[in-house]
Design a protein with these regions (language model features):
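Conserved P-loop NTPase "ATPase switch" module shared by AAA+ and STAND
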Residues: 67-94
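Post-Walker A alpha-helix
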Residues: 38-40
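Hydrophobic anchor at the beta1->P-loop junction of P-loop NTPases
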Residues: 27
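N-terminal pre-Walker A segment at the start of P-loop NTPase domains
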Residues: 1-16, 135-139
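Conserved glycine(s) of the Walker
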Residues: 33-35
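Structural recognition of the conserved hydrophobic beta-strand(s) that form the central parallel beta-sheet
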Residues: 83-84, 105-114
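Acidic, divalent-metal-binding catalytic cores of TOPRIM
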Residues: 88-89, 122-322
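Post-Walker A helix-loop "phosphate-sensing" segment adjacent to the P-loop in P-loop NTPases
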Residues: 44-55
């Protein structure tokens, strides 16, 4: 499944309207914000159809997954937008993560917990809020909003950079940092970033964390709270290092530009568990047999040649001051 899908769920009192474009969307938030009501309305429509007094507008079937038979039900669903409430304990199981990975459905999961088995994007974590009455009717209009701000102010110059892993992205930022006399360290994986920051709690220097936004959703709650609490910690969360290169126009390729404009139209959810994997394959394929041949595990030195290095840097200068 791929593409952006608009969903409208409404009755004579409530009107939910939102769009989803990735395989996993998370809806968080406090009680009494309408999350469970949304699930109930979709369930009622599935059971009663028009007799429920509920209307659903979407170009894909919307269904609720729940109960003890969830595995069998999920295996038989294809091309659906599947809604799941947090009361279903199976969303925390590794088996569920494996079935999501192999599925060609989109999933909208309502949960206040962080689901560490799933690589969901920081951009697809939402809350629900009532934005008033709908078009002069008595309907309450429910919309989604991003829980975490996507455009953090990173204008300060970092004195230390922490990169998520030890792959090509780390090698690139380490080389840039050395030129700028900035300390650059690897956390050794996204799950280790918070622990590394905990060890630096007493420090007052400006720290910038660089991690793949495409999959860091489960860790975001703790990282964001720490960045707000400390003030000297900033989060730079592009989709991935490969995304930075592809969107820098270092490769003058029209197809790449078209893909980067609307990636959701090209990324098949059953093939790519997270968008980061798609961007890696795209960059590897597009640079194969060229002087810019890309390997995720080790940086090709040509990316550090002055012209290439600056092209990439110019793409991130509005996000991080290096």
């Amino acid at each position: 499944m791929k593409g952006k899908h608009k969903i409208v769920v409404k009755n004579n009192r409530l009107h939910y309207e939102f769009e989803i474009k990735r395989n996993i969307t998370i809806i968080k938030g406090d009680s009494a914000t309408g999350k469970t009501t949304l699930i109930n309305m979709i369930r009622q429509f599935a059971n009663l159809g028009n007799a429920s007094g509920i209307e659903i507008e979407c170009d894909a079937p919307c269904t609720v997954l729940e109960g003890n038979m969830w595995q069998m039900l999920l295996k038989n669903l294809s091309g659906n937008i599947i809604f799941i409430d947090e009361e279903n304990q199976f969303i925390r199981q590794q088996e569920f993560a494996e079935l999501v990975k192999a599925s060609d459905n989109y999933f909208v999961i309502i949960t206040r917990e962080n689901l560490y088995n799933l690589p969901y994007s920081v951009e697809e974590i939402y809350g629900l809020y009532s934005s008033g009455k709908y078009q002069n009717t008595k309907q309450i209009y429910q919309e989604m909003y991003h829980i975490y701000p996507l455009n953090q102010d990173l204008s300060c110059k970092p004195e230390k950079i922490i990169v998520e892993d030890t792959n090509s992205g780390y090698e690139y930022f380490k080389a840039i940092s050395k030129e700028k006399n900035i300390v650059c360290e690897s956390a050794g994986g996204k799950t280790k970033i918070f622990a590394m920051l905990e060890q630096l709690k007493a420090e007052t220097e400006s720290i910038c964390v660089i991690a793949d936004g495409a999959a860091i959703g489960p860790e975001m709650d703790a990282l964001y709270k720490m960045s707000v609490e400390k003030g000297n910690i900033k989060l730079y969360l592009p989709e991935s290092f490969e995304w930075i290169i592809l969107s820098s126009e270092l490769l003058e390729d029209k197809e790449i530009k078209d893909i980067m404009d609307k990636p959701e139209n090209y990324i098949e959810s059953q093939e790519y568990f997270s968008w980061e994997r798609f961007y890696t394959k795209l960059l590897v394929d597009k640079t194969a047999g060229t002087y810019l041949k890309y390997q995720k595990g080790k940086l090709n030195p040509t990316y550090l040649h002055e012209k290439n290095k600056n092209k990439i840097l110019n793409n991130i200068k509005n996000s991080i001051d290096l």
